[in-house]
Amino acid sequence: MYGINQRYLYISFHFFVVWCHAQGEKNHPSPNFKQYVREQGSLTDQLSRRQVRVYQLYSRTSGKHVQIRGHRVSATADDGNSYARLYVETDTFGSRVRIKGAESGRYLCMNRRGKLVGKPNGRGRDCIFTEIVLENNYTALENARHEGWFVAFTRKGRPIRASKTRQNQREVHFIKRLHKGPQPFPNAEQPKHFEFISFPSTRRAKRNRKHQTAS
């Protein structure tokens, strides 16, 4: 009888521990992984080395490439134009980037009214964009400061006010293309062929030749 009561108490205690553990899990909800990724992706990485990519942005509507000429931004550059070459610098571990014109040295930015402008300094959040790869394989660029505002151009290559843009519009769709012009750093130098350099023969080499002829 004593053994049965002891076993009953043991089983009851075991179920009590399991019940307490289940209640603890209910009180502590599982972490939101998507929210964590979103928060970490919105922080600027100040420690890691910047990764710089070089390409052109082909506008789906204008059929031309994005260019930054001083303060003005348009999508009217031909393929291979020096102003169409862009340096795309990573800002975080995610898909946030800064876009800089290789020829003008200006950054692609968006002001309070949603107008695209070129600025010499691209440290502000208005000069940071999130690359969004769409289902149709096009890329959309959403401004980091103004959520829901995208880079967009008309058929004539003129910038559209970002407050009137949506992700599913053709005007915000771009294709990344390699630049046909000369390669920037670190590929500025073209591959060189090996050159054979002739050195004058040393005294020891002359002695060896005399020894071979004598033998």
From Swiss-Prot:
Alphabetical list of CDD domains matching this protein: beta-trefoil_FGF17
Keyword Nucleotide-binding: no
Coiled coil spans: none
PROSITE patterns documented for this protein: HBGF_FGF
Compartment list: Secreted
Keyword flag Secreted: yes
InterPro entries listed in its UniProt record: Fibroblast_GF_fam (IPR002209), IL1/FGF (IPR008996)
Pfam family, one: FGF
Main localization of the protein described in the UniProt heading: secreted
Record key words, sorted: Developmental protein, Differentiation, Glycoprotein, Growth factor, Mitogen, Neurogenesis, Secreted, Signal
GO molecular function: fibroblast growth factor receptor binding; growth factor activity; type 1 fibroblast growth factor receptor binding; type 2 fibroblast growth factor receptor binding
Secretion signal span: 1-22
Domain of life assignment: Eukaryota
Single GO biological process annotation from the record: neurogenesis
Residues bearing carbohydrate: N137
Reported function: Involved in dorsal-ventral embryonic patterning, by promoting expression of bone morphogenetic protein (BMP) antagonists such as chd. Also involved in anterior-posterior neural patterning and in mesoderm induction.
Family according to the record: Belongs to the heparin-binding growth factors family.
Protein name per its UniProtKB record: Fibroblast growth factor 17
Classification of source organism: Eukaryota, Metazoa, Chordata, Craniata, Vertebrata
